[in-house]
Amino acid sequence: MAPAPSAAGVPATVPAKAVKGAAGAAAKAGAAAEKKEASAETDALLSGDKDAAQELTNLVKIEGPAALANLGIEAVILKGLGDKKNATAREGACTLLANLCEQGVGHEVEPFIFENVLNSLVEAMGDKEKAVQKASLETLKAFVRVMSPWAAQQVLKVVLHQARTAGKWQVKTGCVALLEEMVTACPERMAALMPEIIPVMTEVIWDTKTDVQKASRAALTKLCALISNKDIERFIPALINSLIHPVEEVPKTIQLLSATTFVQEVDSATLALMVPLLSRGLNERPTATKRKVAVIIDNMTKLVDNERTVRPFLGKLLPGLIKIESTLADPEARSVVQRAIKTLREVGKVTGDGSDVKPLEDVDIKATQEQVNKALGEQSLQAQADLSSYLAVLVANLANARNFELTEWESTLIPYITLIKGSKPEQAKAVAKSLLTALAKSTGDTVEIFDDEEEGEDLCNCQFSLAYGAKILLNTATLRLKRGHKYGLCGRNGSGKSTLMRAITNGQVEGFPSPDEVRTWYVEHDLDGSEGLMTVLEFILADERLSMTRDEAVATLHEVGFDDARQNSPIAGLSGGWKMKVALARAILFKADILLLDEPTNHLDVVNVKWITDYLVNLKTATAIIVSHDSKFLNDVCTDILHLNRFKIKRYPGNLDAFVKRVPEARAYAELNTGEDYSFKLPDPPLLDGVKTKEKSLIKMKDVVFQYPGTPAPQLRGVSIQLSLASRVAILGPNGSGKSTLVKLIVGDTEPGSGEMWKHPNLVIGYVAQHAFHHIDQHLDKTPLDYMLWRYQTGEDLEEHMKANRALTAEEEAAKKQGEVFVIEGVKRLFDEIVGRKKLKNSFQYEVSFKNMSSADNQWVPRDDLINRGLERAVLAFDSKEAQRLGMNRPLVRKEIENHFEDFGLEREFTSHNTMRGLSGGQKVKVVLAAATWRRPHIIILDEPTNFLDRESLAALIKAIESFQGGVGIITHSKEFSEGTCKEIWAMNDGVLVASGHDWTESNSKGTKLEKKEEDDEYTDAMGNVHKKEKKAKKESASDRRKAKKDRMARKKAGTYDSADELEDL
């Protein structure tokens, strides 16, 4: 935007030496006199007189770009550049333009340079005078530094044409130098234009002039540095080498790339560098090389965002692939090529070989010119022809890039619209909005510009990009936050919601206000275990970021529900809900301008969710950004929704329901439903001995009492429950009522203090803890595949060995020592281990081995006898091992594990090639769910499963639970989730359980009968090999034998009895 005269430091009357009379004439004698005076000073302007250039600059700052035409300066410059006999005039014209660009009126002269002298300046780099060559290059560099990045495409066409076809090598080296300058001046646009740049550069690097070769190869390295794809970043030097030395380097580079797993979005810049290599690779002789090229094409194309990106390259890849498909002899390699062809056609939306594909329609600049003039006319503005044409070019380029961000259009167009004499900032904004709406409509897009965009105080208005590991999450996204607004951050798992909040907290968002300007606080959803011994009040007072007195801390804790006793209790004793309230108390005391709330309702009961809702609704001085999967909470709290989609952030006013009305495809955020292409599948459990119906109890508790050491009262009192394969139980209750404690008893993490507890010996339980990530926290640098191979490497679940029921108390150790001594036939024997098990009436007997004795001396001992001897832990350990063995008839191999993870919506790329540290929160929970169900559990226990799964994943989980053949127990505060899943309620309150909706039974006489499924004809061994099962001959029953004998007797009587029948009789 042109500065006001006062801002530019221009005096009311301009003292001038070279154009002294020009300003006075402008005020007194009109335009004719101005032109005459300026024309008289032509020699001074073209001689490089800095005072004359400065006076002209000051005048242009006052009068705007019209001054150039009114004073005849444009004609002077054109005349100077075209004066073939006067090198000083040519140099002076270049220098004058450079001075104007560098002295603050670049936008004013930009349309003139672009429309009138760009070609002349490029050609001047080949002038016979070195001074003119140098001056023209410096002028072009100065112009590139001030021009709008959205004009780069048209400038690039001129530069690339001259670089390829110019007869003078100085022009070529100058163009290459200009390309390097453009890389610095407008890197994002240059990256997008790489498909146009690379083909030209591959020619220029082979120019016959050594100077051109050297300069272009150096420039190619700088240009390739614009490619942001992390997957190929380390291969860029090899890719450049393959362009320079294709015969030697192409096979080597393809070999390098074939071992790469592509996970990041593939853009046009990446394809521009890769396609020359791949196109040449298709012409290599070895079949293996062609196959690798097809694999790379297939993998990369799957990561292309839309057909506009891939279409320019179809003609270079599809014909080659189709040709080798018909010539390859290897059927496996041919199938790979066919897959690549199919992927290219699907993504590019073509049917043929791509050679006759019409380019996607771009916006016509002439039609855009009419739109610009119309929009200006609506605001009673009229631009000069050069400025109007330049605006049309910028608008067309924005539309062709499908960039319809209002902030981008305003920042691009307003500086030029305000150059029009008499224009005001409000008019410029109105023109930008009008053009944005019109161009979006002409391209088939719809853009909503909300009236409240400019209302209220801005806390943040920045544009930035964000990546997580190798994955681009946001690309030139705009984030604008207003004071007092509550923003709900919506997007699918992996879109970058939590990563964005972390980046804001860590100061990694470019342009976000510093902590000195805006106070930002990230509300953690969990507390570090190292703080567990501190009391709640001590923990608050120990935080150096909170400048408050002890009284303020006590008062705030009272406000969020902590009485004096709870304030002085250790953090370790708090439930998840109370820990969240501690985190909220810290945020209140910090007096933040922006609160970042990541799943604030996790672990909170209904009462506390109501409290935090009321707090946020009444919070007028601070802004909140909220990530939550609780649709009711977002509806009650949010004033706006920020939608993370296709690497951008789009704001929608209103709550979640209003957002869904505007964006119907986002309905999954508000409703628990899922499409056919997004589902979970829980593995069906194996049959259990003695269990004939789904309703027969597998776990029983009666009058169980449990108390943590050091606590004043029991956490569970008189609990009686049953669980079966038919169970669908919601465990409900306020925070701290004992829900998680009960679950820990069920899964064996703890043991009851008193009362009876029984589990079926072969029972397998799958468990996902309240803090789900604790399962994988020690393995974040492993891939999900490696984690599974570690956890189940022995055929048992290694997490089982960490449970409390595997450790012996002192009393149990003493009883075990006495019970280990067996007296058999008068001889003492010392118990060693249990090595086998078989049925004994309604129970089991176990094969016991003894120390220093052979296996021939083993004895079978009933289960009750072993338990009475204090060997219950050994019995339970063996039962657990047997249960796992029975459920582990699936091979622990890569293919089987990948299939299992795909049942939970985790793609193979993430399973085998991404470490868990790089997965989103939702993806990590999928890993935890899949790992917990690998052993095909009979009962699955989920502690707060709604905490980290998005709406679509929740819907998929509900659907999977409906079809699951085992039992399910769920702790949740989500009424929507529990009502959609469970028919039985266990209401916990202060350690007491009240069950309702149950149908408990201990017999097999009633309920749904279990039927043994037919076994598959094939099975996979531990090495992943597939084998056919031999069908066993059916054992002949006594009834069958009697029937066969009767048939033989009848044949004997009828005279049809033969020798074969005689053998059968024998």
Swiss-Prot record:
Classification via PROSITE patterns: ABC_TRANSPORTER_1, ABC_TRANSPORTER_2, HEAT_REPEAT
EC assignment: 3.6.4.-
Organism ancestry: Eukaryota, Fungi, Dikarya, Basidiomycota, Ustilaginomycotina
Family annotation (InterPro entries): AAA+_ATPase, ABC_transporter-like_ATP-bd, ABC_transporter-like_CS, ABCF_EF3_subfamily, ARM-like, ARM-type_fold, Chromo/chromo_shadow_dom, eEF3_ABC2_chromodomain-like
Cellular component terms (Gene Ontology): cytosol
SMART domains with a match to the protein in the record: AAA (SM00382), CHROMO (SM00298), TOG (SM01349)
Keywords: ATP-binding, Cytoplasm, Elongation factor, Hydrolase, Nucleotide-binding, Protein biosynthesis, Repeat, RNA-binding
Predominant location: cytoplasm
Biological processes, Gene Ontology terms: cytoplasmic translational elongation
Ranges where the ABC transporter domain occurs: 454-672, 699-1015
Protein name: Elongation factor 3
Residue segments, region Disordered: 997-1066
Localization per record: Cytoplasm, Cytosol
Reactions mediated catalytically: ATP + H2O = ADP + phosphate + H(+)
Gene: TEF3
